[in-house]
From Swiss-Prot:
Name this polypeptide is given: Large ribosomal subunit protein mL51
Keyword Acetylation: no
InterPro entries: Ribosomal_mL51
GO terms under cellular component: mitochondrial large ribosomal subunit
Keyword Oxidoreductase in record: no
One Pfam family matching this protein: MRP-L51
Record note on quaternary structure: Component of the mitochondrial ribosome large subunit (39S) which comprises a 16S rRNA and about 50 distinct proteins.
Protein keywords: Mitochondrion, Ribonucleoprotein, Ribosomal protein, Transit peptide
Single Gene Ontology MF annotation: structural constituent of ribosome
Listed PANTHER family: LARGE RIBOSOMAL SUBUNIT PROTEIN ML51, MITOCHONDRIAL 39S RIBOSOMAL PROTEIN L51
Similarity comment text for this entry: Belongs to the mitochondrion-specific ribosomal protein mL51 family.
Subcellular location: Mitochondrion
GO BP: translation
Amino acid sequence: MAALVRGLMRRVAALPQAVRSVSGGGQRHEPYRPLPITSPLAGLPRNFRVREPPKPQKVDRWTEKRALFGVYDNVGILGGFQIHPKHLIMGPKWLRGWRGNELQRCIRKKQMVGDRMFMDDYHNLKKRIRFLYKRFNRTGKHR
């Protein structure tokens, strides 16, 4: 047994040692050029690369959101400034003429349209109500 261990130790000792140096050692991305001593990079490893800027992406300028941007801007001009564009936007039925925080809003939605919701949406709504209920009861000035 001892002879086996000695034999293995000789093999391990014969392996070449890794060369370490301050300049980084190992394979470089560019040929080695010595830096002047006054350089701010002297003594640092030279294994960093400068990345090129990303290529410009092609953007669809006529998506629905971009095409309809500013669609209600002329309401004041054409309508004699009688109505504000925010009054043209109708929200969901359960929110019209009603104000409240997010928990109250979710509970109201569950009461009014919960029976007609898809199962996944209903499940996510219940999870949100559970989370908000815990949060509102643990923190805030409304405790």
